Amino acid sequence: MTTNEEFIRTQIFGTVFEITNRYNDLNPVGMGAFGLVCSATDTLTSQPVAIKKIMKPFSTAVLAKRTYRELKLLKHLRHENLICLQDIFLSPLEDIYFVTELQGTDLHRLLQTRPLEKQFVQYFLYQILRGLKYVHSAGVIHRDLKPSNILINENCDLKICDFGLARIQDPQMTGYVSTRYYRAPEIMLTWQKYDVEVDIWSAGCIFAEMIEGKPLFPGKDHVHQFSIITDLLGSPPKDVINTICSENTLKFVTSLPHRDPIPFSERFKTVEPDAVDLLEKMLVFDPKKRITAADALAHPYSAPYHDPTDEPVADAKFDWHFNDADLPVDTWRVMMYSEILDFHKIGGSDGQIDISATFDDQVAAATAAAAQAQAQAQAQVQLNMAAHSHNGAGTTGNDHSDIAGGNKVSDHVAANDTITDYGNQAIQYANEFQQ
């Protein structure tokens, strides 16, 4: 970037996009998780990119934490089959923008336009499994794997995106988020104790959809979803039923008539045996018996592309210590600014914290920085009040009323200005970075 670079403001679907003039030719391409996505051209590289605006990241502590989680994941997960963070910046309006490569289309759109030939199904599944092997090795579960979250370019390179909903690999995990068609049965049955196997189930559903050109389990609601799964797999085995924690769910499942499974070779008669065998290993009721991503890569169906020396795992587990933290917005804000500065390898900013420190130490430093900002803001407000009082000593009562109202405004402005000091260098990097 050059020192004369500046932020340019434009409207996209009624939403303000405020980006540096490094990027031009903005066009909306859709909504991602909690943000609007536009295509653009990077004038430094002349390459197309996708720019995702995070909507109001500091409006609530929940949104701030969610944005922090997505940023941390994008910085940590670096793999050919995962969307890659190329740039991140904070606008003067304090919106956050993620810049990634632009893939052109997604699997959902592709499946709507044409049936996939065998070699494309095989190659796309291989890349999905390759990406999942890496993600799972980092201790991360995607949780929302579906065709629209699988991006593809004109060279058939595939990348998994939207890690905004990803969660820690934790056998006590609760809740569900995935789109119903691709949701693993253990999520519907228990809402807890699920692990990386939920992504394998989702990948299996996507595999079947690529083969047939339509969703395998298009449930209209939870009950119908479970019903059509049992149409193919039969009734869940007793060891799965025994894991159901919800009394109402247990009563529902045990009240259903017994169903025998349909052999996959009968259900998918025209599909090659290796594909049927792998699909059957991915779509297993018991998650403990479901094939892993690593084993699926070694399956005969993946043989044309399988290369054990080129299917990497993560260098380190992702640090989830922040996941249970309940912090105020200003603390998340300081931590977010520091992550942005670290991405651009800019150090030494006032208020910047050491992101290599333990999470507890980061929180302590960020909390202290936020408190210092509030103290500075309060001091500035008092100075403003003193100045107004001095300047307005000879004014009328109405004038004093106006000044008092103005003090409320300047209180708010001063607080915002001071806390934003921690982001000043994140904004200013536009004038310093990549010179």
From Swiss-Prot:
Changing F318 to L/S: Activates HOG1 in a constitutive manner, without the need of a stimulating stress. InterPro entries: Kinase-like_dom_sf, MAP_kinase, MAP_kinase_CS, MAPK_p38-like, MAPK_Sty1/Hog1, Prot_kinase_dom, Protein_kinase_ATP_BS, Ser/Thr_kinase_AS. ATP binds at V29, G30, M31, G32, A33, F34, G35, L36, V37, K52. The active site is at D144. One of its GO terms (biological process) is positive regulation of transcription by RNA polymerase II. Activated by tyrosine and threonine phosphorylation. Inactivated by dephosphorylation via recruitment of PTC1 to the PBS2-HOG1 complex after adaptation to osmotic stress. PTP2 and PTP3 inactivate HOG1 by dephosphorylating Tyr-176, while the PP2Cs PTC1 and PTC2 or PTC3 dephosphorylate Thr-174 in the activation loop. It is an enzyme of class 2 (transferase). Disruption phenotype: Leads to sensitivity to osmotic stress (induced by NaCl, KCl, and sorbitol), actinomycin D (transcription inhibitor), galactose, sirolimus (rapamycin), UV irradiation, and methyl methanesulfonate (MMS). It is found in: Cytoplasm; Nucleus. The modification Phosphothreonine is found at T174. Activated by PBS2-mediated concomitant phosphorylation at Thr-174 and Tyr-176. Dually phosphorylated on Thr-174 and Tyr-176, which activates the enzyme. One of its GO terms (molecular function) is chromatin binding. Its cofactor is Mg(2+). Belongs to the protein kinase superfamily. Ser/Thr protein kinase family. MAP kinase subfamily. HOG1 sub-subfamily. The TXY motif contains the threonine and tyrosine residues whose phosphorylation activates the MAP kinases. Present with 6780 molecules/cell in log phase SD medium. Interacts with CDC37, HOT1, KIN28, PTP2, PTP3, RBP1, RCK2, RPD3, SIC1, SMP1 and SIN4. Proline-directed serine/threonine-protein kinase involved in a signal transduction pathway that is activated by changes in the osmolarity of the extracellular environment. Controls osmotic regulation of transcription via the stress response element (STRE) in promoters of target genes. Upon osmotic shock, associates with the SKO1-SSN6-TUP1 complex, phosphorylates SKO1, and converts it into an activator that subsequently recruits Swi/Snf and SAGA complexes. This is Mitogen-activated protein kinase HOG1.
